[in-house]
Amino acid sequence: YYYGGTTPVERTFGGRWPFNLYATNGYIVYVMQPSGATGFGQEFSARHQNNWGKITADEIIACTKAFLKAHPFVDAQRVGCMGASYGGFTTMYLQTRTDIFACAISHAGISSISSYWGEGYWGYSYSALASANSYPWNARDMYTLQSPLFNADKINTPILFLHGTVDTNVPIGESIQMFTALKLLGKPTAFVQVVGQNHQILDYKKRAEWNKTIYAWFAKWLKNQPEWWNAMYPEKSL
């Protein structure tokens, strides 16, 4: 797990990402603090500006490989990753850069920097800092080459997209278009919309279902136990 947005990862249990529950499900949990997070000084956070994943992806890939090398009891063929918001973007972008992950989960992630730039309550204000002085018309390479959507054909990792249907921060279209691209490319993927929820899943029952969805996806791809997922989301033929 890596950050949601650029909020620092805390050394806590419980909360939105209950690492202790993943451990009780038999997973080894590795939590990273990539560059760009706030709270570690201006130089550290400034690495996020006009970068959109380059440094972060390099760090996550290098750290994951180093962790696997240092802990040989971890099965390198069964590693999953997940993140939310900017961390959801990171999840998508990582899969365009590496195949070291057996599966991935993006919650409320950004798939196209150019569409997110003018969307939602936060798109423009967030981009004013994260993409300072860079716009779709004067920084075309960043807006396209760093956008997962424009690199969807490079993805082989099964990705689960989760998104609240009334997300005002990262509009749900960001997940819809990436899911559509991967389906057209014949890549393994799934998309679960959480009805009536915003950027965070706050309704108790819906949050419980959201958590179960995450566990079921990991069980399917990391434990070779698809039964839970299939029971929750049986295949449908149109």
Model-inferred region functions:
Residues 1-2, 8-25, 31-238:
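Active-site-proximal cap/loop segments of hydrolase catalytic domains
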